[in-house]
Regions:
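Gly/Ser/Thr-rich phosphate-binding loop
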Residues: 41-44, 61-62, 69-74, 83-149
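Short, low-complexity intrinsically disordered segments
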Residues: 20-23, 134
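Conserved AMP-binding/adenylation subdomain of ANL enzymes
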Residues: 1-18, 25-90
């Protein structure tokens, strides 16, 4: 999969990836895709003790303020919750988009309102939205079988 990512996402070779990740390590999304992407490209992975659930999302927001990356790989619920916070917090919005190259979601559909809000905020903060992509994968075999953007 890392060869596929390198072919489809040349951004990864352009500069070392930096990612904040809460996803469970026993799952192919975090354990195979994200972790191996960081290793293959000499990047930095920051482990997030929060996640998109009540009582833990504030931890994710604090970590994001400190370690926003050039990659944001997550599930749609995370991005929906993040959009609500960024609508109220311009500093958080600036931190999230400041260095962001790629926004990736998987695990479910990203609703149109969240997609539109992320594009709009990206334009407001950097003049254009980051590359927004998704992937169809197979948990049993590999994290990605098809990538679309």
């Amino acid at each position: 999969n890392q060869a596929q990512y390198a072919t489809v996402l040349p951004h990864l070779a352009a500069r070392p990836p930096k990612m904040l990740d809460w996803l469970p390590w026993n799952h192919v999304f975090a354990g195979n895709s994200n972790f191996n992407m960081i290793l293959a490209n000499g990047g930095s992975l920051y482990l997030d003790g929060g996640k998109p659930v009540k009582g833990l999302f504030d931890t994710s927001l604090a970590n994001l303020r400190e370690h926003a990356g050039n990659l944001a790989f997550n599930v749609p619920l995370y991005f929906a919750m993040l959009v609500r916070e960024m609508e109220r917090d311009a500093d958080l919005r600036r931190a999230f988009f400041a260095d962001l190259d790629i926004l990736f979601y998987a695990g479910a559909s990203l609703d149109a309102a969240t997609w539109a809000a992320l594009e709009r905020m990206g334009r407001e903060e950097r003049g254009e939205p980051p590359m927004m992509i998704s992937s169809w994968g197979m948990t049993e075999t590999a994290p990605s079988a098809l990538i679309v953007h």
